[in-house]
UniProtKB/Swiss-Prot annotation:
The lineage of its organism: Bacteria, Bacillati, Bacillota, Bacilli, Lactobacillales. The keyword Ligase does not apply. Bacteriocin activity requires interaction of alpha and beta peptides in a molar ratio of 7:1 or 8:1 respectively. The keyword GTP-binding does not apply. Kills Lactococci. GO terms for biological process: defense response to bacterium; killing of cells of another organism. Pfam families: Antimicrobial17 (PF08129). This is Bacteriocin lactococcin-G subunit alpha.
Amino acid sequence: GTWDDIGQGIGRVAYWVGKAMGNMSDVNQASRINRKKKH
């Protein structure tokens, strides 16, 4: 029904937001490691 569609939509958005947040934290960790290597 409609609620199932809404639930799927929210789940999909949450999944992609979570992926994006994870990618951003990975990038932040990588830049932190790179900074440590330089010093």
